[in-house]
From Swiss-Prot:
It comes from Acinetobacter baumannii (strain ACICU). This is Queuine tRNA-ribosyltransferase. SUPFAM superfamilies: tRNA-guanine transglycosylase. Substrate binds at D89, S90, G91, G92, F93, D143, Q188, G215. Catalyzes the base-exchange of a guanine (G) residue with the queuine precursor 7-aminomethyl-7-deazaguanine (PreQ1) at position 34 (anticodon wobble position) in tRNAs with GU(N) anticodons (tRNA-Asp, -Asn, -His and -Tyr). Catalysis occurs through a double-displacement mechanism. The nucleophile active site attacks the C1' of nucleotide 34 to detach the guanine base from the RNA, forming a covalent enzyme-RNA intermediate. The proton acceptor active site deprotonates the incoming PreQ1, allowing a nucleophilic attack on the C1' of the ribose to form the product.
């Protein structure tokens, strides 16, 4: 993996990632393909919205269809017919979302499969082996996602376990498996700045190809999230990619880019599309509202996606009211293209030296003031 920083405005960065299966321009949004598919999308649809990289889920693919099936296809790329880069999460977040269904020990985590109730064991080494079979361009370490809320003691105990697991991930990935694909560390520590520092410094000692911010978008108030983003990205290595995991409101992505983050993923655009909530240049359209019944305009006149070029809001309203599958498909195409256009717009603005104007326009269209942002030291 190679990362180049091509430009900067304040703390916002313009970069380029070169991976085994292609080049990724940053800032970038990665559509989530949990089970080896982005819900409601054909592979050619994902190409059409100009996604550069997608995310796969180690936990779910390990349980179903299982490694043997994917191994027979030579990896996840051929299995799902996607020839561009793939990032896979380690399965840690999903395991720790199981609550009482899992038991954490130093060796790893034992849990009951949500599919059939069978007992499953997942460890740092097993996670690395799964992602090696998947042949992910970017592999994420296996860690414990610190819950919210957590006391200082709980968050510290959790991050220290994650650091021990991080070292095991690095050893197995590089030394045992000889995997040449990128391995990213994940910074934990809850909402505590001293613990975030401890986690980051521990990961830097081990050494990774990129660094992710974990443990956000887990129920904390937005003010808490912004507080972490105010100080943490700027402490992360300036020559490595920075990835904010699972944070996905458009405003949150813009604010994170302003603070120096490069990579994003979230289920929000696909999940919201299935509920008739569509992101547009001026904010949000809730298409089930009766005011759209006779609306002859496109969903977003500024959008170049298949949905906006071909269909009216009235038609989308009709599909939603009828419960037609096509409503979710067209909405997903639009929402994911919106997210690609958002990050494209930020990349162009960073290239052209107009990033501040981009941010001002983004908020002005929503009738909002530009929030304060730390200036570069």
């Amino acid at each position: 993996m190679k990362f180049e920083k091509l430009g900067q405005s304040g703390r916002a960065r313009r970069g380029r990632l070169t991976l085994e299966h292609g080049v990724v321009e940053t800032p970038v949004f990665m559509p989530v393909g949990t089970y080896g598919t982005v819900k409601g999308m054909l592979p050619r649809d994902i190409e059409d919205i100009q996604a550069q990289i997608i995310l796969g889920n180690t936990f779910h693919l390990y349980l179903r269809p299982g490694l043997e099936v994917i191994k027979q296809h030579g990896g996840l790329h051929d299995f799902i017919k996607w020839n561009k880069p793939i990032l896979t999460d380690s399965g840690g977040f999903q395991v720790f979302s199981l609550g009482a269904m899992r038991k954490i020990k130093e060796e790893g985590v034992t849990f009951r499969s949500p599919i059939d109730g069978s007992k499953v064991f997942l460890s740092p080494e097993i996670s690395m082996e799964i992602q090696h079979v998947l042949n992910s361009d970017i592999v994420m370490i296996f860690d414990e996602c610190t819950p919210y809320p957590a006391t200082h003691e709980e968050a510290q105990k959790s991050l220290q376990l994650s650091l021990r697991w991080a070292k095991r991930c690095k050893t197995h990935h590089h030394d045992e498996l000889k995997n040449k694909n990128a391995l990213f560390g994940i910074i934990q520590g809850g909402m505590y700045e001293d613990l975030r520092d401890e986690s980051l410094n521990g990961l830097l000692e081990i050494g990774f190809d990129g660094y992710a911010i974990g443990g956000l978008s887990v129920g904390e108030p937005k003010e808490e999230m912004i507080k972490v983003l105010d100080y943490l990205p700027n402490k992360m290595p300036h020559d490595k990619p920075r990835y904010l995991m699972g944070v996905g409101k458009p405003e949150d992505i813009v604010e994170a880019v302003r603070r120096g983050v490069d990579m994003f993923d979230c289920v929000m655009p696909t999940r919201n599309a299935r509920n008739g909530h569509y992101f547009v240049t001026d904010g949000l359209v809730r298409i089930r509202n009766s005011k759209y019944r006779h609306d002859q305009g496109p969903l977003d006149p500024h959008c170049d996606c298949y949905t906006c070029k071909n269909f009216t809001r009235a038609y989308l309203f009709h599909l939603e009211k009828c419960g037609e599958m096509l409503a979710s498909m067209l909405g997903t195409i639009h929402n994911l293209r919106y997210y690609q256009r958002l990050t494209e717009g930020m990349r162009d603005a960073l290239d052209n030296g107009t990033f501040d104007e981009f941010v001002q326009d983004f908020y002005a269209r929503r009738g909002l003031e530009v929030p304060p942002c730390p200036v570069d030291e």
